[in-house]
Amino acid sequence: MKPIFRRVAVIGKYPGPGAVSASDSARQIIESIAQFVTQQDCELTLEAETAAHTGLTQYHTLDVEGIGRQCDLCLVVGGDGTMLGVGRRLAGYGTPLVGINQGRLGFITDIPLEGYQDALTPILHGDYEEDVRPLMQACVMRGGECVFEALALNDVVVNRGSTSGMVELRVEVDGVFVSNQRADGLIVASPTGSTAYALSAGGPMLHPSIPGWVLVPIAPHTLSNRPIVLSDATEVAIEVAGGRDISANFDMQSLASLQHGDRILVRRSAHRVCFLHPRGWSYFATLRKKLGWYEGGS
């Protein structure tokens, strides 16, 4: 049976310069996956940086945007951080993503590297679970102009520097004042991000099907400042009212330094990310496994 995905791209995590043994390992992993994909009668494309850093230059290559324009499916080899970066860049193209976990936790890169062939074969032939996740669009407003803009799949975080004191943040939802918060920072998390930094800060987990966000203070000065669940149809505005050495992070991968009076506006993006999982995948099974929940029995 012919695969339904004809043009398949592979984007891999690769080590920095000087890590020879890690580089050799990355090359072996990517080459194994590339060979497997071609054996499935698919046209293989390697992301250009992946090919250059692993020395696998014998394959057809494209940059990430080219993959979005020309490929039917993208395999992301790495951890959740790798997937977050790729997801944001491909969101505007609608390219479905499959995660092969080479990292630690792997909430969204859920296929283990060992035995990936058994999980990947049915997906390539159309047997999979589809999992669509929303994105957040954020911009930093300064003097009435947007000076920095980014997408986020997990979260938007406004926080203090490592050597500074608490920050004071004025929070509005749809133009309505909520509170001034004195804390180490504030997290606006999507359902995807609710199991990341927001969870460690005491926030709730949101099921991916919930069209909502969670607003989570980081170490608030007032203990009554608790997490709030919001509709993702709202616009959240966070204004820097006090503190120093303050920054805004988007999925902890892009950063903007902030000044007093800056406003960070967060709204739902028009783009979404589509993950494909093996048949039988379950969000709750993922939570049980990754968070070590008790399953009962003797």
Curated annotation (Swiss-Prot):
Its EC number is 2.7.1.23. The keyword ATP-binding applies. Keywords: ATP-binding, Cytoplasm, Kinase, NAD, NADP, Nucleotide-binding, Transferase. It catalyses: NAD(+) + ATP = ADP + NADP(+) + H(+). Its cofactor is a divalent metal cation. One of its GO terms (cellular component) is cytoplasm. InterPro entries: ATP-NAD_kinase_N, ATP-NAD_kinase_PpnK-typ_C, NAD/diacylglycerol_kinase_sf, NADK. It comes from the Bacteria. Its main location: cytoplasm. Involved in the regulation of the intracellular balance of NAD and NADP, and is a key enzyme in the biosynthesis of NADP. Catalyzes specifically the phosphorylation on 2'-hydroxyl of the adenosine moiety of NAD to yield NADP. This is NAD kinase. It comes from Acidovorax ebreus (strain TPSY) (Diaphorobacter sp. (strain TPSY)).
